[in-house]
Amino acid sequence: MKYMIEYTIRDTGLTYDQNFANRDALLKAFSTWKPDAGLNVMAFVSDLASNGYVLVEADDPKVVASFVGKFVFWNDVRVNPVIDVMEAVPIAGAALAWARNAV
């Protein structure tokens, strides 16, 4: 299963010094991180500010929860299960056919 993880580094309401300390702690924690067994990181990108996306694949959702849990102290996170668009198109077509026949 693939998951798109959206993150925003939390800085709202922090003082100048707290913001620096928060970023410093996050960078130190991230420098020691390695993906757990069973977590395939397909893309890890930043918008060059305080937000980013991580596309991961894992058979066990607990592996994804473990990854997210490690960084939730610094980030607001949203996890969305996703499928490849080539898989989504026939599903959408079948759903449309069903909806047309349902009414």
Question: Which role does the model predict for each range below?
Answer:
Residues M1-V103:
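Conserved, structured core segments of small domains
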